[in-house]
Amino acid sequence: MGCGCSSHLEDDWMENIDVCENCHYPIVPLDGKATLLFRNGSEVRDPLVRYEGSNPPASPLQDNLVIALHSYEPSHDGDLGFEKGEHLRILEQNGEWWKAQSLTTGQEGFVPFNFVAKANSLEPEPWFFKNLSRKDAERQLLAPGNTHGSFLIRESESTAGSFSLSVRDFDQNQGEVVKHYKIRNLDNGGFYISPRITFSGLHELVRHYTNASDGLCTRLSRPCQTQKPQKPWWEDEWEVPRETLKLVERLGAGQFGEVWMGYYNEHTKVAVKSLKQGSMSPDAFLAEANLMKQLQHKRLVRLYAVVTEEPIYIITEYMENGSLVDFLKTPSGIKLTINKLLDMAAQIVEGMAFLEERNYIHRDLRAANILVSDTLSCKIADFGLARLIEDNEYTAREGAKFPIKWTAPEAINYGTFTIKSDVWSFGILMTEIVTHGRIPYPGMTNPEVIQNLERGYRMPRPDNCPEELYKLMMQCWRERPDDRPTFDYLRSVLEDFFTATEGQYQPQP
């Protein structure tokens, strides 16, 4: 037993349990429960929480308490539904589904990790974005739904315990831009952007700059808008029965088969790739799919589940805007500025740098195999599938389906696919991006492309392609694979292509 010394007790009740002689706080009996007797004679069992060891919890808000950022409707046996703003206690934190108990209903079940945030932290604030890079802050703020003055506060990438403010603004020359301000720490725990005015906390800082710009580029209008996150896939559902899938809309046909928008178990929107019968060995596919599902990154299309009997189905996350090559030709795609186009290239190269780090080769990198979300986020699809195809029209270089125009010379001539042949393909993909989906080597047949490459020919610089970007393409097309850059290098160049010569943060106002 122990005392949880507090400054005072409420004086409208009297207890019929032992109290501490020093502070008169109730001492928890051995059964961990106490009976409180109110002056009106009613009795209630007090849910005093027992704790291990001799010391009480340091904070009244325990670390395992979370608040729901969004409402969630249960859709599996064992998951727990909740309303936005509801408090839950996390019982087990493992993987993407956490076991929790609702403090409202007392019920227990599994909850999606990305629908909740720690209650005793900044995470529930709509303007706070945890683990967000400067570049991703720009992408979020420039996405549809945000306007002039939209803002967010994020953790500093370089200094632990520090923060940055990112604000959407309008520039006469550049159009919609995002400006960044360092939020500096005071020795006493406060914060400031300008030394002229300091704040005890970030909430006070946000309130001040919401009322007036006071030296910032603009007044803060509203927190950055984000969509409800996609719930994680239920972990036990990998090889699924075909009847659990309902194919709704045929989105297109590719080298491997048809792609459909559909629903899994009537409630989860997914993309379903139906592979042509005989196009690959089911056993080889399942072995590769088991490897592919371990490759999880925000720039890779997430593989959810498979149907392993022919025709093979691959179930992945659904991307609303379809393939990049098609999206670039739409009215929305045609309007994209060179800045946004290069940002798409930077997103793709980020995913390829991840595959490079994992020693994984794509083998078929082109705009047709990049998918685009409704917020213009780009993700790489079909990584690894190309080597499983058993169709001679695809595997032989003379075949009608072989993607000659995207393939490195050593892969065309000798079948040598490496991460460096992927780098060559990425150079071709960049031409697709800056030309809004134009087929590479316009006017040339596949045999003509092969002959010209053997003579050292390279595509000329496309119209509206920055000179520095074309130099990067030419590096990707170097004859010797080892002379081509790494994806990690390409990522570092493309992420800051237009900001390398500018200050990344605004001066103090």
Curated annotation (Swiss-Prot):
Positions bearing Phosphothreonine: 159
Substrates-to-products reaction catalysed: L-tyrosyl-[protein] + ATP = O-phospho-L-tyrosyl-[protein] + ADP + H(+)
Interaction with PTPRH as annotated region, ranges: 154-242
Residues annotated as domain Protein kinase: 245-498
Binding site for ATP: 251-259, 273
One GO process term, biological-process aspect: response to xenobiotic stimulus
Gene Ontology terms: cellular component: cytosol; membrane raft; pericentriolar material; plasma membrane
InterPro entries with a match to the protein in the record: Kinase-like_dom_sf, Lck_SH2, Lck_SH3, Non-receptor_tyrosine_kinases, Prot_kinase_dom, Protein_kinase_ATP_BS, Ser-Thr/Tyr_kinase_cat_dom, SH2
Family annotation (SUPFAM superfamilies): Protein kinase-like (PK-like), SH2 domain, SH3-domain
Lipid moiety-binding residues (S-palmitoyl cysteine): 3, 5
CDD domains: PTKc_Lck_Blk, SH2_Src_Lck, SH3_Lck
Active site (UniProt): 364 (proton acceptor)
Quaternary context: Binds to the cytoplasmic domain of cell surface receptors, such as AXL, CD2, CD4, CD5, CD8, CD44, CD45 and CD122. Also binds to effector molecules, such as PI4K, VAV1, RASA1, FYB1 and to other protein kinases including CDK1, RAF1, ZAP70 and SYK. Binds to phosphatidylinositol 3'-kinase (PI3K) from T-lymphocytes through its SH3 domain and to the tyrosine phosphorylated form of KHDRBS1/p70 through its SH2 domain. Interacts with SQSTM1. Interacts with phosphorylated LIME1. Interacts with CBLB and PTPRH. Interacts with RUNX3.
Function recorded in the entry: Non-receptor tyrosine-protein kinase that plays an essential role in the selection and maturation of developing T-cells in the thymus and in the function of mature T-cells. Plays a key role in T-cell antigen receptor (TCR)-linked signal transduction pathways. Constitutively associated with the cytoplasmic portions of the CD4 and CD8 surface receptors.
Identification of the protein by name: Proto-oncogene tyrosine-protein kinase LCK
Protein's organism: Saimiri sciureus
